[in-house]
Amino acid sequence: MQLFLLSFLCFYSALLLGLTTSAGRNEVVRSYSNTPLRVLLDKGQQELRIKSALNLIYVKEVDQELWTKFTGQVVIKISRSKKNITINGNLFKSSAIYLRGGPQHTDPIQYASGFYRGALKVTLTPEGLLMTNIIPLESYLYGQIAGEMNPSWEMEALKAQVVAARTYAMYMIKHPKHPLYDLEKGTGDQVYLGAQSEAVRIKIAVESTRDQVVTKGSLPIKTYYHSRCGGFTESAKLVWNNSEKYNRTSVPCQYCQKFPYLWKTSVKAHEIFKVLKIPLEKLKPFKISIANKSSTGRVKEIAIETDHEKHSINSEVLRHLLGYANVKSTRFDLKINEDEIQFQGTGAGHGVGMCQWGAQFLAKNGKSYREILAHYYPSYKIESAQPYF
């Protein structure tokens, strides 16, 4: 191992790498594009294996200035005392460390099949090792957009997606999902693939809309978006039955009205009973039906009735329990065939906010990204982000 002090350990580098204190995240950020974002990559692990394209790993304890250089793969484990972290058998006193894939913050570091710029932070928690990617917000977008939209799509659609994703991420920085991270890398927030998904057209879309966000009162809103709405988008309040204050307006969607995405799937009744934790001995006889729909045709609640009891479940919760890949949206009808429930529907996703296929259609028909965003987020503004940390 070789110890050395990196010359760029100054406030700017700290901000760029996300090595700021919690107090630092509340200070005014002069350069919005350098705002550090904390993306959850994994948690609850007993061991983590990290590599880099340069075959070098730089490691730093959170409360130290010195970085340790390792060659090749590093294996991170929990110490026998359960209070510290070890790397390749070397004990580190801290319960949290930073890792980078080279001397520059842009050098990618590898975990599993993903490559990530910025830094990785590994924290020892009661549940195991938790790992986040600390990365400047605009750099995050380079590796995030392809996870949600095809880079070959119309440029104005890509720009609309960039602004929506940037706004969502900035909102989550201010309203983090967890004390240790702002958002997750999967469909629970925004799909983030990392550096290997970067593309020239994505970088153009990011740079040409730099700092632009969807706002209300000069603050970023929570910009939901989805694949296909099926003809109309839906109010967030109706979908999640909560006090969601943004995305409360349903709008017609031209593309989905003309080219609806049709799907169908079948689920055994006992599978639904199982996820709802209803005893299987109470399975028969049963009746399952749509309790009510919204004005746009989306199912709000499902009613399940047996001789013993009655249940109702929010349709979006049911999608989550049965799998989003199975029940693709809440725009569906039900049919019972003996002990099998058949779903037949249209659209894909929760239906709230921007419809991505609708955005593509609008872009193909000459609409700008600002016009696209104004259609799906009516009554909100598109403006340059104002520092609000």
How does the language model describe each region?
Residues 1-389:
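Conserved, single-site charged/polar hotspot
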